[in-house]
């Protein structure tokens, strides 16, 4: 199943507690909490390019499944990590954050840091 496509965020759960847990300042959280993001995923075999647009901020990450890559995080840090594909789930671990992007109807992303779980749901456009 291909992840390729454009997705519009439709809902999110536990945004503020999760963003505080990863260290985003309160003023930044307040500025972005009502913004809905758009994600574009381009998949060519095991090669991916993910472009996330939230308000004026655009983040682009490219990676190959199973190979170490450096990616930009929501906090602005660059982190080395490895992405894995497990059926319809794209998994990555970033500094203690476990992220699972599950391709379902709709598309669901769940991120966990300790016992704080952030869930965002997007719809394919």
UniProtKB/Swiss-Prot annotation:
- Protein's cellular compartments: Cytoplasm
Q: Name one GO cellular component term.
A: cytoplasm
Decide whether keyword Membrane is in the record. Answer: no
* SUPFAM superfamilies per UniProt: Lipocalins (SSF50814)
Q: Which GO terms describe its molecular function?
A: lipid binding
Query: What Gene3D superfamilies does its record include?
Result: 2.40.128.20
- A Pfam family this protein belongs to? Lipocalin_7
Name the UniProt key words of this record, in alphabetical order.
Answer: Cytoplasm, Lipid-binding, Transport
Q: Which InterPro entries match?
A: Calycin, Fatty_acid-bd, ILBP
Instruction: Give the family from UniProt.
Output: Belongs to the calycin superfamily. Fatty-acid binding protein (FABP) family.
* Name the record gives this protein: Fatty acid-binding protein, liver-type
The scientific name of the source species is Takifugu rubripes (Japanese pufferfish)
Gene name of this polypeptide: fabp1
């Amino acid at each position: 199943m291909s992840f390729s496509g454009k997705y519009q965020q439709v809902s999110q759960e536990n945004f503020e507690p999760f963003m505080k847990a990863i260290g985003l300042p309160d003023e930044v959280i307040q500025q972005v909490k009502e913004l809905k993001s758009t994600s574009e995923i381009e998949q060519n075999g095991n090669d991916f390019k993910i472009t996330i647009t939230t308000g004026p901020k655009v983040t682009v990450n490219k990676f190959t499944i199973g190979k170490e890559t450096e990616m930009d995080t929501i906090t602005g840090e660059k982190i080395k990590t490895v992405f894995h594909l497990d059926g319809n789930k794209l998994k990555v671990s970033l500094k203690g954050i476990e992220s699972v992007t599950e391709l379902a109807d709709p598309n669901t992303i769940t991120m966990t840091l300790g016992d704080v779980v952030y869930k965002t749901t997007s719809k394919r456009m």
